[in-house]
Amino acid sequence: MKTTMRKLVALLLSAALLTSAFAGCSSGGSGSSGTESETGSAASASTGEESGAESSSTATGEVTTLKIMGIDKTATVDSGEISLSDWVAGGSPIYDAFVEKLAEYGVALELDLIPEDQYQTVCQTQLAAGIDADIMNITPLDDQTRLNLVDQGKLISINEVVENHSEGAAKEYYTNGNGAQMMNKLALEDGNTYWLTDITIALNEDDEVGQGAAMSFMIRQDWLDALGLSAPTTTDELMETMKAFQENDVNQSGEADEVLSISLSDFSSGLSNFYGIGRTMSGELTYVNTETGTVESPWYHENIQSYIEFVKSLVDAGYVDTSDQLDEKKAENKIAGLFDWAGETWQEVGITVPEGAAAAYYAPVVLKASNAAVETEPYLCWQQGYQLGGNKYAVTSACEDLDAVGRLFDFLVSDDYRILTEYGLEDYSYTLGEDGSYNAIKDAEESDAQQLAAGCALWTNASILPRFELKSAQDWATELQGYQDAGKTMGYPETGFEKKKEFFDEYSDYEYKLPHESNPELAPATAEELDTISSITSDLTTYSEELLTKLILGQQSMDDWDTYMADLERLGLDQLIEINQARYDRAQGNA
C-alpha cells in the first residue's frame, strides 16, 4: 500500500523511551501490515484529575503506547483544509494539550490514520491480513462482520476493560453513570458490549436529561420578505407560496425555476412529519414512535396516501427539483426549501444572489397537513436528550495491555477530555463566561481554534475516539443565540437569523415530536435477526423506493394500493417491523 494511502503517526515521549523502556501494546509492530509510513513525534499526555488514584505507570512517569487505527479526519476552515494528521505532525496547541493530558494517565498513542474514502477498503484488508491495532474504528464494517469478529474472539468486551482494568472513572461511568445506558443498549446476546460509541446528552435547567437540537423543513425567508409574504403554516399555503415565488421570479433568473428539495424515493425530507409520519432515512423502512414505544412503517400510516398525493401535486406543478442536484441548484439560487438542522447556517453559504438582493436565509416552518385523511398535529424531528451515535470503536485481541486501555477509557470520560474535544483551550479557542458558558473565539487566526469554533476536535466524530458531548442549559442557550448571531455576519447585521432562534423558542416545549433519526438506539441484531434482515432488505428496499417514486411521478396508480401493500408484506416489511420492535424492546430493557 502506498504512503499516500496511509499515514502512520507515532506519538511518543521520546525515541529513547520507546526503544529502551516499553514494547507497544499490540502484538504486531507498526510495520507488521507491510506498509510504508510517515512518523512524527510529540509529547504525549492527558489529565488525571478524575481518576481515583494514579496508576503505577503514571506515578513512575512510565507511558504505554496504544496503537489506534482510524480515519484521518479533515475539515475546511477559514485558513483552508486541515486534517488530524496535520495536527499530529505539529502546530496545534489543542492537540499538544490532548497529548499532554493523556500522558498523565500513562498512555501515548500511535495513530494509523487513513483517508476517509479509503478507510472501508483498508479495514477489510486489515481483517484479512490480521488486525495489528489495539483499538480500531470499526464503523464501516457491516453488522454481520462485527458479529463474526466477536464470535472469533477478535474483539475484547468493553465490560472486561471497564470492570477489570479501569482505575475507577470509566467503571463508574459505564456502570452507574451516563454510559450505563449505552452498555445496555449495545449489549449482544451474551450480555456484553463490544464497542464504544458517541454519547450526546442535553441537560435542562434542572440538570436533568432534556432534549437536543431539531431538524426542520425550511424555506427562503429572504424570498418571503422580498414579496411581503408571511411564512406558510399549512401545506396548501406552501403551494401558494411556491406559486408566488415562480410567478414573481423571486430569484430574478428569468425562469420559473424556484423549486423545493424533496426526496422522492424515501421519507427523509421532513414533509412526511407534517402528516404525523415518522422520518425514515435512505434505505430504511421503519421508524420508532417514541410516544407509543412501537416500531412503525410509513407505508402503514393512515395518512400515507395523503402525503403522497401532496408531494405529487408539488411535482405536477413544477415545484420540486427532480434532478437530484441539490448542491448545484442551491448555489444557483434556485432552492426555495429544504430539510436540515434548524439552526445551522451552512446551507446559506455559497449561494449567489443577484446584485442588490438580500442574502440567502433559510427559516424553519411548521405546516399543518391540509389534505390529511386523519387530522393530526404536525410532528417535529427532535434530537433526543440522550443520544447514541453511529460510530463504533473496538478494542481488539491484538492488545496486550488492557490496563493501558482502561486508563485511556478513564481519560475519555473525564471533563478534561470533553472540554478539549468540544471547546479546546481557554483564551485560545474559547473564553469562559462569568455564567460558566464556553464562548468560542469566532475570529481566531489559528486553524485548530477555527475548527473548535465551528465544530469539535478532529480526533472524534468518526476518527479515532468517541465523542462525549454534554450540553448544559447554559451551553444550549449560548448555542441558540449563536444561531441568530451568525446571521449578523451573513447579510443581516441588525437582526441576524432571528427566525432560526425563534423556532426553538416557540417549539422547545412542543408536544408532538419524534426522533430525528429513523431507528434510535436499536439493540444490535442477533445472528438470526441479521440473517432475516439480510435476506429481505435488498428486494424490499428496492421495491419501496421504486414504488414511492413512481406513485409521486404518476407512473403508477393509487387505485392499486391494496396490491402494493400485499407486495410489501410478501417482501418482508412486517418481518422487519417485528425484528426492529424486538431490538427496540431489548434496548429499553423490556425484553
Give residue spans per PLM region.
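C-terminal motif of bacterial Sec signal peptides marking the signal peptidase cleavage site
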Residues: 20-24
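Conserved small-residue motifs centered on glycine
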Residues: 419-546
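Loop/turn elements at helix/coil->beta-strand transitions in domains of secreted/extracellular proteins
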Residues: 62-66, 104-109, 129-134, 154-156, ...
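Helix-loop-helix "hinge/cap" segment bordering the ligand-binding cleft or interdomain interface
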Residues: 159-161, 190-193, 197-269, 288-334, ...
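Bacterial N-terminal signal peptides that target proteins for export
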Residues: 1-12
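Extracytoplasmic/periplasmic substrate-binding proteins
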Residues: 72-101, 146-148, 202-218, 225-231, 265-474, ...
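Conserved N-terminal structural module of periplasmic/extracytoplasmic solute-binding proteins
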Residues: 10, 25-218, 223-237, 282-287, ...
